[in-house]
Amino acid sequence: MAMHAYGLSWIDEQRLFEVADHVFGKMLSARNGKPLPPDPFTLVAQAKLLDEPLQAIVDFDDLRSRNKSLSNAIGLWHQKVLGLSPRLTELGSNGGGVDLRTAPGVLLPMWEKPGYFEVKNRFNTIKASDEKDVWDKLKFLAQSNGAVSYLVQVIPGAREPYDRPW
């Protein structure tokens, strides 16, 4: 029996624990290192415009920064957890701009083709200026590999699951 039981039969639960420990441990150790300096101009302007004490704005900015670090870690965690599936391969930073692909020999049942996946934690994590690049990468991988590509949004913009062309 696994040392850590989460009720997920499709992945090795010990590896899930190790992934969580690694991703979030790395995030926490980075946060405990030397923090980036805040933008004093933005902080002063925000305090004046919102009529808030400067210290309250400084504290809020620190909390916002911590939240951003956590959000980024959660996005990476989702990618790595999905990569634990024996049917998927995590591509990491060498993935040609995408996060996952189906494991060798695995085909998507609906298409009978391999798949490539770009994983985003939330629907709004792609800047509008980057959407075309993501689209072009997914299209290129699909066309050049006889595959299907997906943009996976763990938290979509609406509260219903969907599978539709982008």
Tell me what each language-model feature is.
Residues 92, 107-109, 140-144:
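Short, conserved, surface-exposed binding loops centered on an aromatic residue
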Residues 98-126:
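Conserved catalytic cores of phosphodiester-cleaving nucleases, focusing on short active-site segments
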Residues 22-38, 115-134:
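Generic detector of solvent-exposed, compositionally biased contiguous segments
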